[in-house]
UniProtKB/Swiss-Prot annotation:
Membrane disposition: Single-pass type I membrane protein
Entry's Gene Ontology BP terms: adherens junction organization; calcium-dependent cell-cell adhesion via plasma membrane cell adhesion molecules; cell migration; cell morphogenesis; cell-cell adhesion mediated by cadherin; cell-cell junction assembly; homophilic cell adhesion via plasma membrane adhesion molecules
Organism: Xenopus laevis
Glycosylation sites: N427, N560, N683
Span of the signal peptide: 1-26
Function description: Cadherins are calcium-dependent cell adhesion proteins. They preferentially interact with themselves in a homophilic manner in connecting cells; cadherins may thus contribute to the sorting of heterogeneous cell types.
GO molecular function, a single term: beta-catenin binding
One GO cellular component term: cytoplasm
Name of the molecule in the record: Blastomere cadherin
TM spans (from-to): 707-730
């Protein structure tokens, strides 16, 4: 060790210091420039036994507090030990020491809240030499690899490797030693040390290193707890040949926090609200701040809140308070008035070290919300209005109020009430936009009854007042304006019974109307507004209603024996008033309709016919209807029989003898209960059938219904259309005869280009596709311009697969074609385009290129007509041509 280390940690100085601490428990002197903390970062207490009893004193730690207060709060990292207020370290319960040293930490806080820690090592001197024990009491801690155990021997569980604590932001010098790693195998051979893990060979790399031979572990630069709170490394020990001599030992380096970060508010501006008029102690809002420093093991991250400024400072400077721990802002004063001060801005401070450290400032804006502490007041408080009579829903007056509360809130919204509203003639509502009261008429006012109304209206808010306030009242004087009112029928609805046999001009009723304008003398005139059947007449002057003699209870205009007419009455005022009334006539029935049977046409079989049931109806009502009586007349009783049923509402009609097929007319005489008789002719058709006849079959065969006739005609028309389409199709399918030869001026672009012109015949060049196509494409038909000579069809040789035989193929097929009289003129082997006169290739000898020595005479082609002229020119010719 160098002289500096001996000077800093002499064992004699340490023993003297401990004795001094025992004699002088506290020094009540405040030294200027004092640095608080433990006097040493590491303490080693040696014992000479493995087991330590409870209450045994191990040693003492010294804390420099730089104040006159007595310090007494320590935090021990091992629950088996405790520290007295004066720094004495005692055994709290029975402890058994093993081969490893027992290590733990002791922490405390100074007056500013800064945490300080020191490392404690309890060493059993039986496992250390005397020199090592003396060295450990004054040097940096030494970590020894635990002993290996083989076999089934159980490992000791109380071997604890204390963490190495390093303060962040240390100034150095660097590299700085932290701890020495030792192995007991150094006694046997040379040991080399290394470390791996976080901060060594894994990111962040290079922070820690170890001297290979001495085992001193070093830190190379200042640490930052906000980046990494701790580092976990593994120490290794190997021999000279690279073999591991110890199991890897885990080392934890804990970074001790320093107060190097200011608090930060979580928002630039905090906003809250509180209602005016609330009681002190009401919670308003909260602010919050964060600090990256440690708030668990130190006060570096413990934040305290305070209010620095209130703007405005009205009505008192300190209206609000803040909880220094939680940041909750509450109201502590009274006098909040939104109408005067709608908003407060607080400047708040967050300070770490529980209020004694670094600070940050923020803003808290508190909005004062409205309370219903202002009553609405009428402005003005008296109104006059003129209202025409008989108007319902007429807007009488709009009433205005003034309310100092916040517009649009329930504390501002006005609610109007009519204090006295006799008869319910008026109604008042609130305009949601302007907050005005709208006074309207709920019923029509009558000038003749009352000419003026005085109304008192009160106003409040939609929510109750937060404080006792007076209620404002307004007075509205309403004057009724006289207008010409329409006359009124008395009664409005008149009901009269009248017989349907009312004679023309006979009085039905005298209608009466009254004019509400009693102070005016006006003439009334009566009219009929709506008379659907035009049965009535009214006297314009006196309102007497008479009939025109056409009333009919059985008319379609009469519903449920009643006939309704709308009556009108007018006055001669300005403007003319028109009143409406209703006249309901209850039409009394008379026996003016006789009973009739139904149906009046039916069919019946000639064999065992079923009786025909006829229903009897009468347009009248009882007692002018049933019971009915029936009889037959005009000779119908000779062949037919009529009987009533038990109820007397229907009859059965049946023949008395077998009837022949045909149509019969039956005269049925019916009478009602009042002997009103009605003769009706019923037509019966007798069919050849037996039993019940629905329709006569002869009718079905002889005659057809219109739909059946239309279907038949449609089918015939469709058949004709299909026949015409078929004929057109067959006509289009006829073969059109094409000309055998092309016209003279019709040229074909089938010119074969010869490589040399005028160089003589080249009859060895063959276009095999043309030859093959010319033979195979012959139409399979007989000539129709001359009578053909019946000959056998020539046999053409198929094209050989061997190219060497192509010459024989051409000669044989050419000879067969020359001897084929059935071949048409256009079935030539080659077709050449006309190249004009004077062509150097005017003579093409393909026709004479056959190897056959037989000569053919084609002059007969000239006798076949103009169509074969070109072919005769090609194959025929005179002797001069042959010589050429």
């Amino acid at each position: 060790m160098g002289g500096t280390d001996k000077f800093r940690y002499p064992s004699v100085w340490l023993c003297g210091l401990l004795c001094l601490l025992q004699v002088v428990p506290s020094i009540n002197v405040d030294v200027s420039g004092c640095q608080p903390g433990f006097s040493s970062a590491n303490y080693t207490f040696s014992v000479n036994r493995r087991e330590l009893e409870r209450g045994r004193k191990l040693g003492k730690v010294n804390l420099v507090d730089c104040t006159t207060r007595k310090h007494g709060l320590y935090d021990v990292g091992d629950s088996r030990f405790r520290v007295l207020p004066d720094g004495t370290v005692l055994v709290k319960r029975h402890v058994k020491l093993h081969s490893k040293d027992t290590r733990f930490t002791i922490s405390t806080w100074d007056a500013r809240g800064i945490k300080h820690s020191t490392n404690i090592s309890v060493v059993n001197k039986r496992h250390r030499s005397g020199e090592e024990a003396r060295s450990r009491s004054s040097e940096l801690p030494v970590l020894t690899f635990p002993e290996k155990h083989t076999g089934l021997k159980r490992k000791k569980r109380d071997w604890v490797i204390p963490p190495i604590k390093v303060s962040e932001n240390e100034r150095g010098p660097f590299p700085k030693r932290l701890v020495q790693i030792k192995s007991n195998k150094e006694k046997l051979s040379k040991v080399f040390y290394s470390i791996t893990g976080q901060g060594a060979d894994t990111p962040p790399e290079g922070i820690f290193r170890i001297e290979k031979e001495t085992g001193w572990m070093q830190v190379t630069r200042p640490l930052d707890r906000e980046e990494y709170e701790k580092y976990v490394l593994l120490s290794h020990a190997v021999s000279e040949n690279g073999a591991s001599v110890e199991e890897p030992m885990e080392i934890t380096v804990t970074v001790i926090d320093q107060n190097d970060n200011r608090p930060k508010f979580t928002q630039p501006v905090f906003r809250g609200s509180v209602r005016e008029g609330v009681q002190p102690g009401t919670k308003v809002m909260s602010v919050s701040a964060t600090d990256d420093d440690d708030s668990i093991d130190s006060l570096n991250g413990v934040i305290a809140y305070s209010i620095l400024k209130q703007d405005p400072e009205e009505p008192i400077p300190n209206l609000f308070t803040i909880n220094r721990e939680t940041g909750v802002i509450s109201l502590i004063g009274t006098g909040l008035d939104r109408e005067k001060f709608p908003e407060y801005t607080l400047t708040v401070q967050a300070a770490d070290l529980d209020g004694a450290g670094l600070t940050a400032e923020g803003k808290a804006v508190i909005e004062i919300t409205d309370a219903n502490d202002n009553a609405p007041i009428f402005d003005p408080k008296t109104y006059t209005a003129l209202v025409p009579e008989n108007e319902v829903g007429f807007e009488v007056q709009r009433l205005s109020v003034t309310d100092l509360d916040m517009p649009g809130t329930a504390a501002w919204q006005a609610v109007y009430k009519i204090r006295v509203n006799e008869g319910g003639f008026f109604n008042i509502t609130t305009d949601p936009e302007s907050n005005q009261g709208i006074l309207t008429t709920a019923k029509g006012l009558d000038f003749e009854v009352r000419k003026q109304y005085v109304i008192q209206i009160t106003v409040e808010n939609a929510v109750p007042f937060s404080v006792p306030l007076p209620t404002s009242t307004a007075t509205v004087t309403v004057t009724v304006e006289d207008v010409n009112e329409a006359p009124v029928f008395v009664p409005v609805v008149s009901r009269v019974d009248v017989s349907e046999d009312l004679t023309r001009g006979e009085k039905i009723v005298s209608l009466v109307a009254q004019d509400p304008d009693k102070q005016q003398i006006q003439k009334l005139s009566y009219f009929i507004g709506n008379d659907p059947a035009r049965w009535l007449t009214i006297n314009k002057d006196n309102g007497i209603v008479t009939g025109n003699g056409n009333l009919d209870r059985e008319s379609e205009y009469v519903k449920n024996n009643t006939y309704t007419v709308i009556m009108l009455v007018t006055d001669d005022g300005v403007p003319v008033g028109t009143g409406t009334g209703t006249l309901i006539l209850h039409v009394l029935d008379i026996n003016d309709n006789g009973p009739v049977p139904s149906p009046r046409v039916f069919t019946m079989c000639d064999q065992n016919p079923e009786p025909q049931v006829l229903t009897i109806t009468d347009a009248d009502i009882p007692p002018n209807t049933y019971p009915y009586s029936v009889s037959l007349s005009h000779g119908s009783e000779l062949t037919w029989k009529a009987e009533l049923d038990s109820k007397g509402t229907s009859m059965r009609l049946s023949p008395t003898q077998q009837l022949k097929k045909g149509d019969y007319s039956i005269y049925v005489l019916l009478a009602d209960a009042q002997a009103n008789r009605q003769l009706t002719v019923v037509n019966a058709t007798v069919c050849i059938c037996e039993g019940k006849a629905i329709k006569c079959q002869e009718k079905l065969v002889a005659g057809f219904d219109l739909p059946i006739i239309l279907v038949i005609l449609g089918s015939i028309l469709a058949l004709l259309i299909l026949s015409l389409l078929l004929l057109l199709f067959l006509k289009r399918k006829k073969v059109v005869k094409e000309p055998l030869l092309l016209p003279e001026d019709d040229t074909r672009d089938n010119i074969f280009y010869y490589g040399e012109e005028g160089g003589g015949e080249e009859d060895q060049d063959y276009d095999l596709s043309q030859l093959h196509r010319g033979l195979d494409a012959r139409p399979d038909i007989m000539r129709n311009d001359v009578v053909p000579t019946l000959m056998s069809v020539p046999h053409y040789r198929p094209r050989p697969s061997n190219p060497d035989e192509i010459g024989n193929f051409i000669d044989e097929n050419l000879d067969a074609a020359d001897n084929d009289p059935t071949a048409p003129p256009y079935d030539s082997l080659l077709v050449f385009d006309y190249e004009g006169s004077g062509s150097e290739a005017a003579s093409l000898s393909s026709l004479n290129s056959s190897n056959s020595n037989n000569e053919h005479d084609y002059n007969y082609l000239n006798d076949w007509g103009p169509r074969f002229r070109k072919l005769a020119d090609m194959y025929g010719g005179d002797d001069d041509d042959d010589e050429e």
